Amino acid sequence: MIKSFSFSKSSKVIVELGMGDGRLLEKLAKCDGNIHSDYYIGIEIDKQQYEEANRRINLVNIGLLNGSFEDIVPIFPDDCFDLVIAVLPDPDFIDILKRQKWESFYKVVYSKLKNHGSFQLITELTDELLQPISNKVYYKWVEWLSTTFQSMGFILLTKEEGAPLDYSTRCIDQFRGDPERIRMITLTFGKSIMMNLNQDWLTSEHQL
């Protein structure tokens, strides 16, 4: 399955976890001027959405996989991806109460990133009673997300309220219609082996 993908070590590889109907992946690939060197991989567990994307998308630089990204991502070699995108992941992969379940998966994602590769997370916060989300609650949640992923080795590069303006998926478009009760955040994390080594060195020096 993985071996059938035609990208080389010099290729730029972009992966979307849970691509849905593939509209975002397709748009990113179409806007990419490096069709012969950049390769896009979409992973979707829902067979109906996967088949819809497979019928519609015919770009040579896109490969689609039907299955759980939790099972598929570990199959790829380490230091393979330039960018991994997760758009509004299922609560099983981002909810505070389920951190023990999903933290190990994102550590795998980290290992699959090339040095200086990045992981873009777009997720949302809602209230159980569907009340508006206050700034205090929102910023506390964003800080928790940021520090949680940094504890795994990721480096926080950028954070921006909402989803990127040029991103469109069924859920993103729906959530944009209710920004007070559904508050999204886009966090972009990086992987820098040298920076992490320097941080480890400084920590050990401080302990001495």
Give the ranges of each region predicted by the language model.
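Class I S-adenosyl-L-methionine
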Residues: 131-208
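A short glycine-rich, Lys/Arg-flanked "PGG" loop and its adjoining helix->strand segment in the class I
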Residues: 100-115
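Conserved alpha-helix/loop element of class I SAM-dependent methyltransferases that forms part
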Residues: 1-10, 27-30
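A short SAM/SAH-binding and catalytic strip from SAM-dependent methyltransferases
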Residues: 82-100
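A short acidic, Gly/Pro-enriched loop at the edge of an enzyme's catalytic core
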Residues: 74-83
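Class I SAM-dependent methyltransferase SAM/SAH-binding core
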Residues: 23, 28-63, 70
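Class I SAM-dependent methyltransferase "Motif I" SAM/SAH-binding loop
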Residues: 18-22
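Conserved beta-strand signature within the Rossmann-like core of class I S-adenosyl-L-methionine
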Residues: 116-124
